[in-house]
């Protein structure tokens, strides 16, 4: 009887397959700063109108980001920018607020994608299939476009905030915890747009409370001393 030789094992190739249709890229800007909203953008690019030079927004100059911002808005099939406010960040925490902003950005798209690609390693809850891609802003053009829209939108917000609170220097540091920003927090305390749930801001708020309480105590003591009645003078003589 002829012996049966074992056949070589054949592994089935698993090729990625995705349903045809529109794909949206999603990214955020502003998770790390001490002030302001976190901004997210969602973009569906038009394959018939390619955009040259799309890349991670952090690797581009401000001028190049501005130029690409306008081109993306003009050529994309649709795009959406959304935010989570400072109050939402302080209530939810920065991670959950970021997921909220991303969810709002996707919901704001005029066209519904069949798939969403998100920069990073976490996904917001969405009603369409989604995939998280680490360093996606450098690998996927739609995510690169979203990173540019989010970054430029937030930088413009910081420029407006600088006009309202020039002593913090928001136009230069964009709300990040630079030495300049930390010194301004030390000197002026927190403004309404600072994130109270972030430790450096919480410390600045606490210092302000202590200083105000100390000033109130000192003022009260000084006022008490100033209105204290004078001691009665000794009689200089008796009168009949």
From Swiss-Prot:
Instruction: Say which domain of life the source belongs to.
Output: Bacteria
Cytoplasm: is it a keyword of this entry? yes
Query: Which subcellular locations apply to this protein?
Result: Cytoplasm
Q: Which cofactor does it need?
A: Mn(2+); Mg(2+)
Which keywords fit this entry according to its UniProt record? Cytoplasm, Endonuclease, Hydrolase, Manganese, Metal-binding, Nuclease
| One Pfam match | RNase_HII
Matching CDD domains: RNase_HII_bacteria_HII_like
Cofactor binding comment, as recorded? Manganese or magnesium. Binds 1 divalent metal ion per monomer in the absence of substrate. May bind a second metal ion after substrate binding.
Which residues make up the binding site for a divalent metal cation?
Answer: 27-28, 119
InterPro entries associated with the record: RNase_HII (IPR022898), RNase_HII/HIII (IPR001352), RNase_HII/HIII_dom (IPR024567), RNaseH-like_sf (IPR012337), RNaseH_sf (IPR036397)
What molecular function does GO assign, one term?
manganese ion binding
Cited PROSITE patterns: RNASE_H_2
Q: What is its EC number?
A: 3.1.26.4
Family named by the database record = Belongs to the RNase HII family.
UniProt-recorded name of the protein: Ribonuclease HII
């Amino acid at each position: 009887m002829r012996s049966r030789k074992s056949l070589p094992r054949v592994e089935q190739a698993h090729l990625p397959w995705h349903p045809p249709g529109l794909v949206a890229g999603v990214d955020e800007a502003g998770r790390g700063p001490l002030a302001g909203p976190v901004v997210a953008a969602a973009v569906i690019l038009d394959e018939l109108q390619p955009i040259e030079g799309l890349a991670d927004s952090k690797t581009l100059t401000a001028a190049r980001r501005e130029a690409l911002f306008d081109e993306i808005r003009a050529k994309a099939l649709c795009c959406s920018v959304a935010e989570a406010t400072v109050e939402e960040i302080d209530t939810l925490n920065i991670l959950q607020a970021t997921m909220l902003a991303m969810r709002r950005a996707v919901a704001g798209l005029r066209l519904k994608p069949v798939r969403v690609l998100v920069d990073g390693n976490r996904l917001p809850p969405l009603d369409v299939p989604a995939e998280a891609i680490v360093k996606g802003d450098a690998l996927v053009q739609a995510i690169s476009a979203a990173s540019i829209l989010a970054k430029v939108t937030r930088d413009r917000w910081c420029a407006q905030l600088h006009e309202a609170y020039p002593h913090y220097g928001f136009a230069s540091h964009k709300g990040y915890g630079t030495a300049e920003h930390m010194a301004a927090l030390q000197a002026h305390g927190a403004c309404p747009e600072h994130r109270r749930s972030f430790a450096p801001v919480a410390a600045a708020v606490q210092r302000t409370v202590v200083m105000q309480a100390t000033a109130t105590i000192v003022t009260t003591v000084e006022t008490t001393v100033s209105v204290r009645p004078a001691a009665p003078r000794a009689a200089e003589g008796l009168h009949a």
